[in-house]
Amino acid sequence: MARSKTSHNWLKEHFNDPFVKMAQKDGYRSRASYKLLEIQEKDRLIRPGMSVIDLGAAPGGWSQVTSRLIGGQGRLIASDILEMDSIPDVTFIQGDFTEDAVLAQILEAVGNSEVDLVISDMAPNMSGLAAVDMPRAMFLCELALDLAGRVLRPGGDFLIKIFQGEGFDEYHKSVRQMFEKVQMRKPSSSRDRSREQYLLGRGFRGRSE
């Protein structure tokens, strides 16, 4: 079957993308690794020995970066609806994060302890229709924030991919209520035409009793 013009243009952009070439050279599974590395360079989110949850982890670019930074004394729980090839010392939970059963598996993996950081690169399959895509994207963001509120230690941090659009302002307000400091990040490795940004919440205020 002949490729569409859109598909051809995507393939051309993909293979000409310097971050794709860097990922292949550096041994990372996706160009997304450089988004996290750039944020890490600026904000020093990830430190040795930390306990981290990585949502939307497949194919594993963020988990690779995080695993290397937290080292053998750290703990990383990764989850995605898609399969992900194993990474040493990473606990992977495959399933749909919108399902209660998958959330329960993540909480079981966390156990009675708390985590230092929740990161999420989740995004729904995009249809190109903002009226459809934004509610789906914001729903995933809300679920990730709810998980963060349940598992983070006081002072913990939260990093999530988010798209500007309907629901963003309300979500930003919710994060500000939960964290001492909230900032936006747009890594240079994020494609110019993409509306994605990363919202960073620092200093979890703790759960209200």
Curated annotation (Swiss-Prot):
Note the SUPFAM superfamilies from the entry.
Answer: S-adenosyl-L-methionine-dependent methyltransferases
Where, per UniProt, does this protein localize?
A: Cytoplasm
Q: Which GO terms describe its molecular function?
A: rRNA (uridine-2'-O-)-methyltransferase activity
According to the record, the residues making up region (Disordered) are 182-209
Q: Which reaction(s) does the protein catalyse, per the Swiss-Prot or TrEMBL entry?
A: uridine(2552) in 23S rRNA + S-adenosyl-L-methionine = 2'-O-methyluridine(2552) in 23S rRNA + S-adenosyl-L-homocysteine + H(+)
**Enzyme Commission number(s):** 2.1.1.166
Q: What Pfam families does the record tag this protein with?
A: FtsJ (PF01728)
Q: Where is the composition biased (Basic and acidic residues)?
A: 182-196
What domain of life does the UniProt record list for this protein's source?
Bacteria
Q: Which InterPro entries match?
A: RNA_methyltr_RlmE, RNA_MeTrfase_FtsJ_dom, rRNA-MeTfrase_E, SAM-dependent_MTases_sf
One Gene Ontology cellular component term attached to this UniProt record is: cytoplasm
Keywords from UniProt, A to Z, are: Cytoplasm, Methyltransferase, rRNA processing, S-adenosyl-L-methionine, Transferase
- Annotated catalytic residues: 161 (proton acceptor)
Q: Which residues bind S-adenosyl-L-methionine?
A: 60, 62, 80, 96, 121
Q: What class of enzyme is it?
A: transferase
Function noted in UniProt: Specifically methylates the uridine in position 2552 of 23S rRNA at the 2'-O position of the ribose in the fully assembled 50S ribosomal subunit.
Stated family: Belongs to the class I-like SAM-binding methyltransferase superfamily. RNA methyltransferase RlmE family.
The protein's name is Ribosomal RNA large subunit methyltransferase E
